[in-house]
């Protein structure tokens, strides 16, 4: 058999010589819709993909429901949520030895299982599910919905009769009407209905299903108070603090309340408060969706509304913004991602401070996993918002349409914005690191009393104003003689509007308002440094994307060109891709600090020992030794020469995550000549083995490609490593 020489493609005597390993990188334009589709088809394809996205979400939920109903222990967990570990699914692995089978056979299972840390058990329990039949029925329902949405996506994307016109996509008022009223408003109203008719009765021991749904009143008075205007009747007689969730013991009859705080039995928000919240959201959004002019000649015209916005004698006006937002898809996506990213971070906060799901506050591993998961997701989404905002400025921004409006002035004043952000980053960085390093030196020289410890008195004052009494500020809700405390009645318990608030905020077993000290002060400023630096990089990358002071106009460069040093004319100054690339590292860095802080603080609260955090968090060695190293000890002993335990999979993942993370640096710190030699060596090796021929011409990675590969490895390894550490160190203490 004649071997094909690996040089044949290079020499040009092979008809496939035009093919190179660069072909692998065609996926980089997979989201460049305008290069792939024309005109209205771009909008139609995006619209159709939304149905596919929803179908995937339903399929994911359906799969979880199916696995738990068939392989989980939902019914056993329901009977004792505090002492039963939830099972995600069974494990069938022929590589398991006897000790592995024994270690992973837990939570009452007959064989090896994976435990659930997703909070799904708590969610399903809270919304009224109680049996495996409930789960399997819901699974089938969502599977059918998923198929229907896939069909809808196909019809709207590929069947000419059902493809929407361009006018449909440009009709902003109708889109707002549909999104605000139908998607947000009606779905919130439907969820309120489920909570009132199914979840709240179930939490009080009353089983509601299709056979008695229409014959059982969710409130003793039915709809009479609604039609008579006596709406307060729905909030009278709420559940007591002693109510045992899932039973009638201590249950009330109220369905829409404003108690505030957390249920002391479940550690979660009151279900009747949640129902009230969703009803209010429904009313607000249904009304908001009908404020704009659609089929009738009433309501606001959005363009007139936006362009009528003149501030300071016409400066900073909004003329041209309506047309810009309504025609520029990257700007629309950037705004949507910015909003969703912020909401996702807020969800992470609520997962621990105001948990909506019963008994999730007592499942520490799940709380830690959900908080960390949502913060990382938020970081990626918000960086994506800046990336698409930058692509908008490079490819879609029209200076003539936006002449002298607020967007144009934002670009004109970019030097001031960037310099102020830069100053803030320098201030935060030098001062925060200076304090940490000073404290490290004092500990190293055995004079801890010389540490600089700053009490966060302003933050403590804000907590005290909300009712936190441990600081002895005696201000507003933390003072029993304050008007805020006494109004509207003189009763100490019911004087404030949210009667359950003071009980919850001063309960040190929850995370509602956690006590803070000098360690918190320092790490808050470290996190502020990370946030501002990430923002600086992203904002500068966006504002200088089309051209900077050094290079006035490089719009034709596009978005994805590298920062290649001053030798090529200083493209570092305006490489938007490079700014995004660098910002991802800072985003990961910042979320690392956030999750370290959150986890260490909560380990102390959960274990009833907050002193270690207060004493060790004021200097860097404390973080490295008493948080990272100390909490790694169980993890790295998941398997050793003497055997293994149930943490072994996390130990392996911890090691593997480090490997992926470290591999990233091979791509990030290297010369391109090295890549050319390496890839040619690989192709030569392939050609020596005739069954694995490599037809393409070997071409090294470009700068952008190598950085992209390195960034992906760095990111995946970074997150896998911390995920393993987080779950293993928490479950090792509270299993």
Swiss-Prot record:
P700 is a chlorophyll a/chlorophyll a' dimer, A0 is one or more chlorophyll a, A1 is one or both phylloquinones and FX is a shared 4Fe-4S iron-sulfur center. It comes from the Eukaryota. [4Fe-4S] cluster binds at residues 563, 572. GO terms for cellular component: chloroplast thylakoid membrane; photosystem I. Chlorophyll a B3 binds at residues 666, 674. Pfam families: PsaA_PsaB. Its main location: plastid. PsaA and PsaB bind P700, the primary electron donor of photosystem I (PSI), as well as the electron acceptors A0, A1 and FX. PSI is a plastocyanin/cytochrome c6-ferredoxin oxidoreductase, converting photonic excitation into a charge separation, which transfers an electron from the donor P700 chlorophyll pair to the spectroscopically characterized acceptors A0, A1, FX, FA and FB in turn. Oxidized P700 is reduced on the lumenal side of the thylakoid membrane by plastocyanin or cytochrome c6. Disulfide bonds: none annotated. It catalyses: reduced [plastocyanin] + hnu + oxidized [2Fe-2S]-[ferredoxin] = oxidized [plastocyanin] + reduced [2Fe-2S]-[ferredoxin]. It is an enzyme of class 1 (oxidoreductase). It is a multi-pass membrane protein. One of its GO terms (molecular function) is electron transfer activity. Chlorophyll a B1 binds at residue 658. Belongs to the PsaA/PsaB family. This is Photosystem I P700 chlorophyll a apoprotein A2.
């Amino acid at each position: 058999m004649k071997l094909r020489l690996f040089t044949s493609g290079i020499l040009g005597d092979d008809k496939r010589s035009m093919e190179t390993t660069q072909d692998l990188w065609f996926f980089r334009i997979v989201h460049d819709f305008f290069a792939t589709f024309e005109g209205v088809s771009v909008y139609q394809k995006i619209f159709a993909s939304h149905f596919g996205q929803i179908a995937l979400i339903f399929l994911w939920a359906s799969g979880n429901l199916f696995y738990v109903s068939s392989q989980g222990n939902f019914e056993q967990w329901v009977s004792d949520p505090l002492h039963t570990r939830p099972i995600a699914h069974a494990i069938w692995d022929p590589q398991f030895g006897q000790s592995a089978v024994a270690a992973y056979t837990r939570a009452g299972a007959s064989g090896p299982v994976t435990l659930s840390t997703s909070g799904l058990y708590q969610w399903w329990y809270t919304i009224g599910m109680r049996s495996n039949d409930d789960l399997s029925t819901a699974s089938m329902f969502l599977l059918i919905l998923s198929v229907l949405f896939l069909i809808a996506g196909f019809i709207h994307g590929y069947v000419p009769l059902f493809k929407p016109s361009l006018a449909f996509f440009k009709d902003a008022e109708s889109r707002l009407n549909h999104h605000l009223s139908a998607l947000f408003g009606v779905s919130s109203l439907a969820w309120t209905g489920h909570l009132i008719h199914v979840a709240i009765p179930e939490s009080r021991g009353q089983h509601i299903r299709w056979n008695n749904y229409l014959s059982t009143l969710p409130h003793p008075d039915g709809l009479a108070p609604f039609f008579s205007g006596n709406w307060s009747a729905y909030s009278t007689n709420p559940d007591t603090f002693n109510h045992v969730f899932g039973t009638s013991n201590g249950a009330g009859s109220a369905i829409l309340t404003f108690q505030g705080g957390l249920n002391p039995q479940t550690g979660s928000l009151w279900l009747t408060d949640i129902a009230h919240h969703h009803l209010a959201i429904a009313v607000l959004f249904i009304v908001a969706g009908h404020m704009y002019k659609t089929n009738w000649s009433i309501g606001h015209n959005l363009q007139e509304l936006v362009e009528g916005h003149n501030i300071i004698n016409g400066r900073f006006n909004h003329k041209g913004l309506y047309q810009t937002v309504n025609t520029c898809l990257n700007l629309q996506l950037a705004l949507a991602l910015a909003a969703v990213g912020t909401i996702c971070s807020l969800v992470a906060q609520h997962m621990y401070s105001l948990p909506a799901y019963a008994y999730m506050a007592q499942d520490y591993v799940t709380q830690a996993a959900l908080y960390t998961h949502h913060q990382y997701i938020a970081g990626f989404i918000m960086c994506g918002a800046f990336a698409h905002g930058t692509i908008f400025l490079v490819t879609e921004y029209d200076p003539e349409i936006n002449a002298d409006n607020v967007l144009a002035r934002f670009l004109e004043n970019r030097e001031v914005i960037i310099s102020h952000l830069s100053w803030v980053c320098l201030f935060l960085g030098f001062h925060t690191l200076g304090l940490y390093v000073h404290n490290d030196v004092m500990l190293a020289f055995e004079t801890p009393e010389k540490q600089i410890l700053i009490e966060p008195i302003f933050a403590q004052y804000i907590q005290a104003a909300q009712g936190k009494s441990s600081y002895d500020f005696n201000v507003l809700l933390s003072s029993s003689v304050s008007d805020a405390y006494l109004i509207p009645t003189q009763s100490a318990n019911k004087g404030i509007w949210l009667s359950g608030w003071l009980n919850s905020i001063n309960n040190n077993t929850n995370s509602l308002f956690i006590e803070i000290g000098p360690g918190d002060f320092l790490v808050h400023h470290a996190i502020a440094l990370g946030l501002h630096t990430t923002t600086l990089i992203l904002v500068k990358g966006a504002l200088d994307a089309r051209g900077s002071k050094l290079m006035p106009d490089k719009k034709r460069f596009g978005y994805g060109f590298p920062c290649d040093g001053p030798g090529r004319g200083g493209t570092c100054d305006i490489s938007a891709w490079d700014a995004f690339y660098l910002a991802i590292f800072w985003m990961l860095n910042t979320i690392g600090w956030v999750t370290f802080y959150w986890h260490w603080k909560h380990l102390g609260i959960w274990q009833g020992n907050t002193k270690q955090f207060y004493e060790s968090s004021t200097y860097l060695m404390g973080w490295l030794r008493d948080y990272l190293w100390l909490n790694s000890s169980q993890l790295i002993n998941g398997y050793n020469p003497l055997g293994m335990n149930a943490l072994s999979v996390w130990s392996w993942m911890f090691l593997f995550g480090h490997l992926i993370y470290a591999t990233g640096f091979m791509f990030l710190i290297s010369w391109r000549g090295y890549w050319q030699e390496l890839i040619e060596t690989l192709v030569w090796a392939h050609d020596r083995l005739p069954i694995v021929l490599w037809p393409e011409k070997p071409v090294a990675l470009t700068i952008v490609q190598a950085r992209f590969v390195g960034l992906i490895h760095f990111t995946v390894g970074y997150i896998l490593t911390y995920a393993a550490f987080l779950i293993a160190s928490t479950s090792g203490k509270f299993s």
